[in-house]
């Protein structure tokens, strides 16, 4: 805090000013990059947010539909559909004041890739902040029906021979994800690599917006894809392909989407940022309740939001998965989590994994200071402040910013304290 003293200042006022400065310095330490006024209301009445038609955007939609933004002093929040993750990025670069958006339902790695300028025009960094995780689990890897005979599920190696034959016959094997370096890209790459298929050498990776996945597979534009719901369920319902694996089978309880905002908006509006989080957290609690699943599916499926039939949303939302290959499970714990088991809290350890995987695939430099980067972007302090004001039970507030070591379906273990050891254990990765 900068303090300007006049020449006529008294010793008493100097001591008082010094004490005040010390107090604000302490607040600055407690809440890096912005402090929260204890009783002040939001600095603004609204914020422009974007979303993609994916079930994991539900908290933003429910907060709008149920008046939760208004409840917390933000009656003018706008929640607008984005055509693709690329459009989300471009509108975040513009910012709300320039007819873009201030924040968004976003793939968890994207704020980091924007913050470092890796995915922005001319590589110009756009400082970003992650305030919360919007969900865990609830994505899937689906495959064209022509590969049903391979019996592929978690073990992607069953596709290896079929892919090699297609290439030998002059075909191109295409696998689709939604944004380079995003969660779907990373799940697809991890799954393929664990099965001995190099995603950079053995297949062609293409980018397709989530709502366009089913239509593109229907006309044979790709052999496999990774995307969130409801698009995998819709694929199966239309008989176009089948789900090989839910992403929760790759990494149970994995982090997925985030609530990301431009850092300048958060810095300028710390109380509004906290109020926004309070509304979103309440919506996440509502979405988590089993009693609300039918209503939730009906709301998000409406024309103004997803424009998707409820039947394409509700099954997997409730944990009932028809994989489309003869495998059907009911009441599985692989369903999307919005609040339970710390789903809303943005664990820094999870962001360390996302950054490590982006190093693995060459999106970030090997010498990236991952811990420093995560500390710049991850604003879990805002989540905690919002939780305190909401009266969230202590049991629902993580004691630390790390969930500890994580184990994947292939036996690999990720220690957030030593991402280099994890990377060294992986046999398939981009050339350094």
Listing of model-derived features with the role each one plays in the protein:
Residues 1-13, 20-22, 27-28, 36:
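N-terminal secretory signal peptides
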Residues 38-200, 204-207, 219-233, 240-253, ...:
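Short, glycine-/small- and polar/acidic-enriched structural segments
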Residues 56, 65, 88, 184-187, ...:
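Stable alpha-helical elements in mature extracytoplasmic
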Residues 101-103, 203-243, 262, 294, ...:
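Ligand-binding pocket segment of bilobal, Venus flytrap-like solute-binding proteins
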Residues 141-142, 258-261, 265-266:
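Short glycine- and hydrophobic/aromatic-rich loop-to-beta-strand nucleating segment
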Residues 269-381:
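Secondary-structure end/capping motifs
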Residues 352-432:
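Conserved C-terminal helix/tail region of periplasmic/extracytoplasmic solute-binding proteins
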């Amino acid at each position: 805090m900068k303090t300007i003293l006049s020449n006529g200042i008294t010793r008493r006022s100097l001591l008082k000013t010094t004490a005040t400065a010390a107090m604000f310095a302490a607040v600055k330490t407690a809440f890096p990059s912005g402090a929260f006024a204890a009783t002040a209301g939001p600095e603004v009445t609204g914020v422009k947010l974007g979303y993609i038609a994916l079930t994991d955007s539900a908290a933003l939609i429910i907060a709008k539909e149920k008046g939760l933004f208004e409840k917390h002093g933000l009656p003018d929040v706008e929640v607008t559909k984005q055509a693709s993750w690329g459009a989300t990025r471009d509108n975040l670069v513009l910012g709300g004041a320039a007819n873009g958006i201030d924040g968004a339902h976003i793939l968890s790695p994207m704020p980091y890739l924007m913050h470092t300028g890796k995915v922005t025009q001319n590589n110009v960094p756009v400082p970003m902040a992650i305030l919360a995780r919007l969900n865990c689990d609830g994505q899937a890897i689906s495959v064209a029906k022509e590969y049903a005979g391979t019996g592929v599920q978690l073990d992607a190696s069953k596709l290896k021979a079929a892919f090699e034959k297609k290439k030998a016959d002059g075909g191109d094997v295409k696998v689709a994800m939604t944004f380079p370096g995003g969660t779907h890209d990373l799940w697809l790459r991890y799954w393929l690599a664990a099965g001995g298929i190099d995603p950079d050498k053995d297949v062609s990776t293409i980018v397709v917006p989530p709502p366009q996945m089913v239509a593109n597979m229907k006309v044979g534009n790709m052999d496999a894809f990774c995307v969130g719901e409801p698009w995998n369920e819709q694929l199966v319902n239309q008989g176009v392909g089948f789900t090989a694996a839910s992403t929760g089978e790759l990494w149970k309880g994995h982090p997925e989407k985030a609530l990301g905002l431009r850092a300048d908006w958060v810095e300028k509006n710390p109380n509004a940022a906290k109020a926004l989080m309070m509304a979103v957290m309440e919506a996440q609690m509502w979405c988590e309740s089993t009693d609300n699943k039918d209503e939730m599916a009906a709301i998000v499926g409406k024309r103004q939001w997803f424009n998707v039939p409820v039947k394409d949303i509700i099954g997997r939302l409730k944990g009932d998965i028809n994989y489309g290959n003869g495998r059907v499970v009911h009441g599985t714990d692989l369903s999307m989590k919005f609040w339970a088991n710390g789903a809303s809290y943005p664990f820094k350890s999870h962001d360390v994994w996302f950054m490590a995987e982006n190093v693995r695939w060459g999106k970030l430099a090997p010498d990236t200071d991952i811990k420093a980067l995560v500390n710049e972007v991850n604003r879990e302090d805002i989540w905690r402040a919002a939780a305190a004001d909401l009266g969230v039970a202590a049991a629902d507030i993580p004691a630390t910013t790390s969930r500890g070591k994580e184990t994947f379906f292939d036996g690999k273990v990720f220690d957030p304290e030593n991402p280099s050891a994890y990377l060294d254990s992986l046999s398939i990765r981009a050339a350094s």
